[in-house]
């Protein structure tokens, strides 16, 4: 039987011979990590066995290079991967750690379910509950919260989640709300944000979910992002960087001149609405910016304007100045999420 694919996506990998960092399509399997030069490649460029390997995160071997994790194999070979942002790295770290633990214990990898262990009523459909929580009108309101000189965008508080469950009569009391919330967390419908909730979720606290206004959580597809506050009040950000970050990640972008496709890290901001793109392997300055106010964004099934690059999951942004940008997501779901987020941003601010 083929090993199960646990997680896949773009990460930047450090070369093992030369000190170069390049974006790779990385696939986490139950027994190892495969990395490909392109998502469409049939055979991997390399494979890292996980049996006996150790994981180091955060890895601070490279100074300014953020969100790096290190895997050391039994042969003492180090492999370094860099994620686009903190939450992406944390998600990879959680799954790699769990895969290594499952190999050690001779178990199959499975997303942890607390339904049986906490005697959750069979009548509760966590998927349906999640959709109710995300309802724009009746669901939980996402907040921008500040703590320890960090701003947490699009997040929820532990006590806020339980308040909502109680007020909507979905649970009889806060204790029952705590059980349901722990299940939502373990099934991946909620993610921990910030040290307090992460430590609890990792098993340091008695309950993996905390009924506290200081414990922060977020929906996995909400555009959550945590950013450091500048302590220097004299720093005036350029206008286009003032907006709140609502989504980020890697996409393929077609060049305007040569029409070739390259992996780029994208950061979407609203009010003012800008989409900045970067070389994912380095450099803090963007390669370019797309002003989204009044733009049109649509999915593209096939187009003579698009030089063929495995034509699935393409979408196009046409700016108010009629500049065309062609982008490609890794999956249909990811394409839909980006289109929706860009449409929302394009209607805000300047």
UniProtKB/Swiss-Prot annotation:
Start and end residues of each DEP domain: 136-221
GO cellular component: cytoplasm; ruffle membrane
GO molecular function: phosphatidylinositol-3,4-bisphosphate binding; protein homodimerization activity; protein kinase C binding
InterPro entries linked to this entry: DEP_dom, PH-like_dom_sf, PH_domain, Pleckstrin, PLEK_DEP, WH-like_DNA-bd_sf, WH_DNA-bd_sf
GO term, biological process aspect, one: positive regulation of platelet activation
Domain PH: start-end pairs: 4-101, 244-347
Top-level taxon of the source organism: Eukaryota
Keyword Phosphoprotein among UniProt keywords: yes
Positions where N6-acetyllysine occurs in the chain: 64
Signal peptide as annotated in the record: none
Purpose of the protein: Major protein kinase C substrate of platelets.
Protein name: Pleckstrin
Organism of this sequence: Mus musculus
């Amino acid at each position: 039987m083929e090993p199960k694919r646990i997680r896949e996506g773009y990460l930047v990998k450090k070369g093992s011979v030369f000190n170069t960092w390049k974006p790779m399509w990385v696939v986490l399997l139950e027994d190892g990590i495969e990395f490909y030069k392109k998502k469409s490649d049939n055979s991997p460029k390399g494979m890292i066995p996980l049996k006996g390997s150790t994981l180091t995160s955060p890895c601070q071997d490279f100074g300014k290079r953020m969100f790096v994790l290190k895997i050391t194999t039994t042969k003492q070979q180090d492999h370094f991967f860099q994620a686009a942002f903190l939450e992406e790295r944390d998600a990879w770290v959680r799954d790699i750690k769990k895969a290594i633990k499952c190999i050690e214990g001779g178990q199959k990898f499975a997303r942890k379910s607390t339904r049986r262990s906490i005697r959750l009523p069979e009548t509760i459909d966590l998927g349906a509950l999640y959709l109710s929580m995300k309802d724009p009108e009746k669901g939980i309101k996402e907040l921008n919260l500040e703590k320890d000189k960090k701003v947490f965008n699009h997040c929820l508080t532990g006590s806020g989640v339980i308040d909502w469950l109680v007020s909507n009569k979905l649970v009889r009391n806060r204790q029952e709300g705590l059980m349901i919330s722990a299940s939502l967390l373990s099934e991946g419908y909620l993610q921990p944000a910030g040290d307090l909730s992460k430590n609890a979720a990792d098993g340091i606290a008695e309950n993996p979910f905390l009924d506290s206004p200081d414990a922060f959580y977020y929906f996995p597809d909400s555009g959550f992002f945590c950013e450091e506050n500048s302590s220097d009040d004299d720093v005036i950000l350029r206008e286009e960087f003032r907006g709140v970050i609502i989504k980020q990640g890697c996409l393929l972008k077609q060049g305007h001149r040569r029409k070739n496709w390259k992996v780029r890290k994208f950061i979407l901001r609203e009010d003012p609405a800008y989409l900045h793109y970067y070389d994912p392997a380095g450099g803090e300055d963007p390669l370019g910016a797309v002003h989204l106010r009044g733009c049109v964004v649509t999915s593209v099934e096939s187009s003579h304007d698009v030089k063929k690059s495995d034509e699935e999951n393409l979408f196009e942004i046409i700016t108010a100045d009629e500049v065309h940008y062609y982008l490609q997501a890794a999956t249909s779901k990811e394409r839909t999420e980006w289109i929706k987020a860009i449409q929302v941003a394009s209607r805000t601010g300047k």
